[in-house]
């Protein structure tokens, strides 16, 4: 299809919108590079999508997509073909450059998200909201591993991707590389996640791809467990409401701030 031609994806010719004045003198090694050609998704059985964002007031005000506060830094994809899973990270808004051409990535994602392939998210409302800021509509079927987890075990303390991945599919996030690079760039702990968009994609790519991989593995597991517990219909019913919940949240309600 139209995205198959070799992609002139690097946007190095474009003036970068972000300027990072604190480039470290010695950066951590990484051999990760973004894909030269956008991956073919048409024959995938299922796709996972996970966004990395600059969401500056997430903790105080909630997700910034509703008020256009922040931007999408990159999109991680997991494409499942039978037993094989291919993962990719498409950086489009990293501060220090190294991004792909965002209009290309946007067109590609529009095609993918409007297709009939099942799309898996972990906390879908968040990612769907941010995709909306890029003028991308996510067409059902939509699957959410957070919803699935809550149906399977309502007594858990937390439903974070990392802890669910470790507990259920033996696949957590490996943050060593990210933490090392983060320390060099001056970001640590909780501060690190919020500032990944300020770091070069070569450090964020492997971490983001892992998120997409864990999300897919988790869904594969949850799908079996939901079936086993006769919860498949209920799960689908709940997940089919996600576009409506998104529309309602996007519409918002009037609040008197006084």
Predicted regions and their residues:
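Short amphipathic C-terminal alpha-helix that caps PH/PH-like domains
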Residues: 1-2, 219
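Generic beta-strand/beta-sheet core signal
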Residues: 49-52, 78-80, 122-123, 251, ...
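Active-site-proximal helix-loop-helix substrate-binding element of RNase H-like nuclease domains
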Residues: 17-28, 70-73, 79-227, 237-238, ...
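Common nucleic-acid-contacting/processivity interface regions adjacent to the catalytic cores
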Residues: 17, 53-63, 232-258
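N-terminal accessory regions of nucleic-acid-interacting proteins
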Residues: 2-59, 68, 105
């Amino acid at each position: 299809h139209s995205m198959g031609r070799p992609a002139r994806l690097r946007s190095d010719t474009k003036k970068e919108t972000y300027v990072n004045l604190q480039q470290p003198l010695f950066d951590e090694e990484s051999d990760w590079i973004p894909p030269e050609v956008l991956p073919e998704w048409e024959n995938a059985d299922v796709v996972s999508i996970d966004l990395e964002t600059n969401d500056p007031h997430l903790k105080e005000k909630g997700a910034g997509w509703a008020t256009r506060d922040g931007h999408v830094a990159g999109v991680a994809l997991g494409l499942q073909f039978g037993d094989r899973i291919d993962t990719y990270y498409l950086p489009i808004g990293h501060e220090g450059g190294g991004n792909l051409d965002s209009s290309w990535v946007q067109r590609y994602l529009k095609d993918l998200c409007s297709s009939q392939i099942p799309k898996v998210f972990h906390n879908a409302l968040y990612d769907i909201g941010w995709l909306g800021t890029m003028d991308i509509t996510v067409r059902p079927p939509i699957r959410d591993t957070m919803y699935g987890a809550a149906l399977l075990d309502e007594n858990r303390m937390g439903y974070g991707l990392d802890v669910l991945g470790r507990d259920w599919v033996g696949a957590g996030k490996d943050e060593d590389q990210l933490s090392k690079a983060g320390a060099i760039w001056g970001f640590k702990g909780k501060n690190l996640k919020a500032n990944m968009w300020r770091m070069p994609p070569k450090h964020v790519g492997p971490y983001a791809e892992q998120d997409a991989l864990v999300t897919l593995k988790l869904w594969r597991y949850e799908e079996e467990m939901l079936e086993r517990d006769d919860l498949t219909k209920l799960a689908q019913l709940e997940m089919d409401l996600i576009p409506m919940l998104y529309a309602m949240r996007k519409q918002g309600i009037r609040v008197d701030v006084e």
